[in-house]
């Protein structure tokens, strides 16, 4: 017995002794020690010098059960050993004999113990595998097996892990999943055309947990005793090999070895129209393998050509000055994924290929020396269009903050569509740190309740000498007002948008439109508009009554101060939400863009908190909802957010405190 076999025997003995202890704590500790011992030597990558040439015998029982939809030109072989012969079959397929079956058994036990949560819940095929476990002890589907709870399945898993430490144990379906991770290969689980209701759970390709390369495939068949025309009882596993391998083992060595399959694949790549008859006897691959390679090569060439044309189409559109939307791009190239589109788009913007995304005329007049100084590099390095574009955007934001003007991201994005949200907030945070005395310019308040002003009529008027000009001059230290180029860009609303806004406002003021229906019916309108109109519906009479209070005894200056105070109170009453809704601080000197942003954030936060609390309560009550049920209650929450919260709950995290 070699030193390797002695170490494996010692590891199995330690695991068998740890089985006698209660629970899995002792067994997990023994598995950690076994992992350190087994990691000192790796599994062989190729067949070594064994005891001699093996006599391959076809398993007639398994051959009679071999399904028609399984790979052709393959034969199940007889394997010697005890138990269900899973590890003996894998050792025979990998190294030509069953000499490493005990080591595969020990490594599989360690894999199942140290990654228990993955095989029970964290795997993509966990539901499929658990259904297969439910049916593994029966020949057909039954209500008893279908209704097994998760706690019972975990107990079966623990019992199977403990039994695997002994050579004569029965292997289940999760042993196949763990074995695939141990040998770093796909396992084609071949199940006979019997027990048809439960066959889809067993007849499938099982992939390893992690694999850094393209894995090969082992074919292992479920074999056993046929019961009737449609049923059979599983008893053992049989290794399945290709017919050419059996013929190669039994044939006498020829005078010259055939070229390896890689040579045939290289020849096929050089000559796409090559047929199998041209190869004749000078190839070591079968006819089906050859034509499968040729078909895959053609598909690969077509895929490469499609990606090439799609990327160049996107580059041309950028150079012409138009950003192709995602939907239009996918209609033209449906084979390209969304992530690939955004990766190419980000690459083009970052490398400066998007020359059409130029800033306005005022920003183009910025000198290159100022750009180079802001970058901290030479003017030659700063001459790249992408770098100059980003630096101008940064200087624009810093200049606005220096003028006490806080540009929201939506206005900033209209000028610089290539800048991401995170970059904007990083620049803004740094600029605010360099300007500790930053205070937004107070907005002009009129005495009276606020009326919805169309953006296209009054927001684009030029600044004139007056209250706004004086406020801007004070904010800039008595200098000239801020130039129009550095003001937030406001796009006038079209006629149909105004009609839509007026219709929504009328329904909200009438009290006939709840918030959830408002979001579904008017997705283009901001949630803050709903709450502003809702507060107007309740505070409007009070505001009107306050506006008409006469003040005959006040002087001219006192009357002006009273009107200013009364206007401030009206604005606060009009913007504040009703009782029971979210609080929002609104003052005469607050930026209206900031008010809208705060209300949007509060509305989004509240609905997210409600959705999180709902999922957390259902998770604690063991009745977690499906996405279909969840989307009926929270239709505005994305599917990815639902699965992210679900994964966090199953990982033991808490979504909402308290």
UniProtKB/Swiss-Prot annotation:
GO cellular component term of the entry, any: chromatin
GO biological process: regulation of transcription by RNA polymerase II
CDD domains listed in its UniProt record: OTU_VRTN
Predominant cellular place of this UniProt entry's protein: nucleus
Highest rank taxon of the organism: Eukaryota
Entry keyword set: Developmental protein, DNA-binding, Nucleus, Transcription, Transcription regulation
Signal peptide, first to last residue: none
One of the record's GO molecular function terms: DNA binding
Function statement: Acts as a transcription factor that regulates development of thoracic vertebrae.
Name the record gives this protein: Vertnin
Record organism: Bos taurus
High-level lineage: Eukaryota, Metazoa, Chordata, Craniata, Vertebrata
Record gene name: VRTN
């Amino acid at each position: 017995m070699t030193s390797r076999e002695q170490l494996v025997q010692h590891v199995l003995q330690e695991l068998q002794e740890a089985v006698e202890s209660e629970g899995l704590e002792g067994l997990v500790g023994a598995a950690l020690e076994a992992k350190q011992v087994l990691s000192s030597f790796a599994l062989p990558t190729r067949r070594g010098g064994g005891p001699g040439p093996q006599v391959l015998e076809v398993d007639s029982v398994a051959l009679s059960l071999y399904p028609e939809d399984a790979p052709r030109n393959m034969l199940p072989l007889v394997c010697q050993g005890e138990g269900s012969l899973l590890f003996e079959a894998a050792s025979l397929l990998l190294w030509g004999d069953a000499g490493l079956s005990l080591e595969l058994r020990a490594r599989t036990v360690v894999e199942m113990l140290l990654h228990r949560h993955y095989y029970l819940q964290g795997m993509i095929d966990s539901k499929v595998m658990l259904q297969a476990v439910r049916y593994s002890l029966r020949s057909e589907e039954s209500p008893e097996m279908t209704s097994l709870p998760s706690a019972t399945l975990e107990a079966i898993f623990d019992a199977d892990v403990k039994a695997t430490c002994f050579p004569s144990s029965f292997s289940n379906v999760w042993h196949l999943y763990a074995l695939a991770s141990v040998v770093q290969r796909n396992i084609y689980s071949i199940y006979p055309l019997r027990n048809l209701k439960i066959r889809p759970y067993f007849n499938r390709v099982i992939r390893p947990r992690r694999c850094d390369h393209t894995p090969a495939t082992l074919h292992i068949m479920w074999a056993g005793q046929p019961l009737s025309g449609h049923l059979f009882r599983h008893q053992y596993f049989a290794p399945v090999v290709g017919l050419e391998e059996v013929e190669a083992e039994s044939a006498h060595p020829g005078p010259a070895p055939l070229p390896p399959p890689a040579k045939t694949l290289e020849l096929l790549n050089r000559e796409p129209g090559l047929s199998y008859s041209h190869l004749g006897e000078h190839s070591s691959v079968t006819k089906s393998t050859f034509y499968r390679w040729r078909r895959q090569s053609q598909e690969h060439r077509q895929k490469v050509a499609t990606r090439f044309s799609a990327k160049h189409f996107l580059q041309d559109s950028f150079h012409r000055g138009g950003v192709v939307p995602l939907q239009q791009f996918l209609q033209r190239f449906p084979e390209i994924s969304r992530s690939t589109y955004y990766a190419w788009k980000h690459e083009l913007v970052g490398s400066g290929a998007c020359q059409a995304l130029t800033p306005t005329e005022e920003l183009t007049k910025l000198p290159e020396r100022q750009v180079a100084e802001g970058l901290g590099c030479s003017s030659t390095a700063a001459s790249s269009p992408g770098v100059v574009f980003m630096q101008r955007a940064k200087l624009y934001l810093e200049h606005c903050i220096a003028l006490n003007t806080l540009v929201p991201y939506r206005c900033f994005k209209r000028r610089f569509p290539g800048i991401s949200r995170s970059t904007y907030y990083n620049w803004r945070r740094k600029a605010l740190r360099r300007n500790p005395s930053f205070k937004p310019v107070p907005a002009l308040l009129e005495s009276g309740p606020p009326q919805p002003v169309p953006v296209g009529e009054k927001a684009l008027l030029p600044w004139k000498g007056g209250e706004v000009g004086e406020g801007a001059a004070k904010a800039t230290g008595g200098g000239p007002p801020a130039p129009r180029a550095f003001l937030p860009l406001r796009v006038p609303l079209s006629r149909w948008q105004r009609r839509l806004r007026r219709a929504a406002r009328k329904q909200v003021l009438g009290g006939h439109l709840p918030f959830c229906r408002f979001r579904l019916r008017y997705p283009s309108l901001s949630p803050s508009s709903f709450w502003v109109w809702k507060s107007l519906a309740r505070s409007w009479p009070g505001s009107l009554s306050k506006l008409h209070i006469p003040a005959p005894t006040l002087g001219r200056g006192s009357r002006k101060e009273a009107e200013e105070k009364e206007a401030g109170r009206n604005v606060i009453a009009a913007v504040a939400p009703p009782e029971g809704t979210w609080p929002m601080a609104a003052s005469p000197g607050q930026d209206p863009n900031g008010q809208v942003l705060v209300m949007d954030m509060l509305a989004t936060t509240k609905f997210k908190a409600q959705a999180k609390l709902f999922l957390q309560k259902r998770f604690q009550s063991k009745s977690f909802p499906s996405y279909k049920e969840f989307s009926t209650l929270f239709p505005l929450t994305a599917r990815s957010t639902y699965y992210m919260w679900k994964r966090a709950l199953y990982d033991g995290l808490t979504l909402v405190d308290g």
